[in-house]
Amino acid sequence: MAGTSLGARFYRQIKRHPGLIPMIGFIGLGMGSAALYLLRLALRSPDVCWDRKNNPEPWNRLSPNDQYKFLAVSTDYKKLKKDRPDF
């Protein structure tokens, strides 16, 4: 057991306990979904500023028609009018 690799030990445990396969699948799916959501937040959120020199306040460049929420049920962003001054 001391000389076996981690993959071989994992495969042996899965072979002994096949009921763990769905749990490992759901945990992997949850971790993958969480990683993709964090990536979406980092790249699409107006609150995140990656370049402070050229774009110090990225939220000021948003127009009212930009949808940055993950899910907007009752808001139609195409019908909104601009009510803010330009910066």
From Swiss-Prot:
GO terms for cellular component: respiratory chain complex IV. InterPro entries: B12D. Pfam families: B12D. PANTHER family: NADH DEHYDROGENASE [UBIQUINONE] 1 ALPHA SUBCOMPLEX SUBUNIT 4-LIKE 2 (PTHR14256:SF5), NADH-UBIQUINONE OXIDOREDUCTASE MLRQ SUBUNIT (PTHR14256). Belongs to the complex I NDUFA4 subunit family. This is NADH dehydrogenase [ubiquinone] 1 alpha subcomplex subunit 4-like 2. The gene is NDUFA4L2.
